[in-house]
């Protein structure tokens, strides 16, 4: 590993795997050492804290002592749990279509329904039912074939791993205090058409850290790395230059 290059860890969200970052590779790999853990197959973790411990083991085994950690959606929940326990390993932090708030009762109920859907019908039906809410309207209109490819690719993930992830998300605590305690600027990537993480709630979170850098996509949903890869890569590169 080149010691002069900063290490950037990109942690994917639920219902996808690390290939979701593929469209960013060319734009960020030349500048940083990019690490993309794949947590999509984990079945033994039942809490975000357990996922964070697995991430710590992975990074330690890779001899990574310092890194910038950017988590997408569920990856953000895990990243906050990681920051709470392993702050000394971090030199930068980002929430990518994610939040530090806990689930409210309605969201917890919805997650219970998702678990039942997975148990009854399996992964492909689950991915089909959730894919429409992942992307902004413009992307869905312009690229319907890519939505089909998304379903075909991620519809093969093991249902047991998806259920474990949903259980962990449902039971996670509020970590706004962790967000406020971060000693470095925090990157927020936000989609105004995000149906899963509402814009209004995330923009409020930007007030918690001592310094925040929000990137707002007017026409993106929950998948900015796919919907707006060039702008995402530019913002990540810019953020990495500031820490």
Language-model segments: residues:
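Conserved HGGG/HGGXW glycine-rich cap/lid loop of the alpha/beta-hydrolase fold
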Residues: 2-48, 58
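Conserved alpha/beta-hydrolase "nucleophile elbow" surrounding the catalytic nucleophile
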Residues: 12-14, 67, 71-73, 191
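Conserved acidic catalytic loop of the alpha/beta-hydrolase fold
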Residues: 50-67
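Conserved hydrolase catalytic core segment
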Residues: 66-104
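Conserved alpha/beta-hydrolase catalytic His-Asp/Glu region
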Residues: 102-109, 121-181
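Short beta-strand/loop motif that positions the catalytic acidic residue
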Residues: 182, 188-190, 194
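Catalytic histidine neighborhood in serine/cysteine hydrolases
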Residues: 199, 203-222
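Catalytic histidine-centered segment of alpha/beta-hydrolase-like enzymes
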Residues: 220-233
């Amino acid at each position: 590993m080149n010691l002069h290059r900063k290490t950037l860890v990109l942690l994917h969200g639920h219902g996808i795997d690390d290939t979701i970052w593929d469209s960013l590779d060319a734009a960020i790999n030349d500048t940083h050492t990019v690490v993309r853990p794949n947590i999509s197959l984990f079945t033994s973790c039942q809490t975000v804290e357990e996922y964070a411990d697995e991430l710590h083991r992975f990074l330690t085994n890779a001899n990574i002592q310092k890194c910038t950690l950017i988590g997408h959606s569920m990856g953000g929940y895990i990243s906050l749990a990681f920051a709470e326990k392993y702050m000394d390993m971090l030199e930068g932090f980002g929430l990518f279509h994610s939040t530090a708030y806990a689930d409210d009762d309605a969201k917890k109920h919805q997650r219970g329904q998702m678990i039942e859907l997975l148990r009854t019908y399996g992964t492909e039906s689950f991915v089909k039912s959730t894919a429409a809410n992942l992307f902004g309207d413009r992307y869905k209109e312009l690229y319907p074939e890519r939505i089909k490819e998304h379903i075909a690719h991620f519809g093969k993930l093991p249902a047991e791993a998806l259920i474990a992830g949903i259980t962990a998300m449902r039971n996670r605590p509020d970590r706004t205090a962790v967000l406020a305690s971060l000693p470095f600027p925090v990157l927020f990537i936000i989609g105004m058409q995000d149906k899963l993480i509402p814009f209004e709630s995330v923009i409020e979170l930007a007030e918690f850290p001592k310094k925040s850098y929000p990137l707002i996509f007017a026409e993106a949903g929950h998948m900015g790395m796919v919907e707006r890869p060039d702008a995402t890569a530019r913002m990540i590169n810019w953020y990495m230059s500031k820490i």
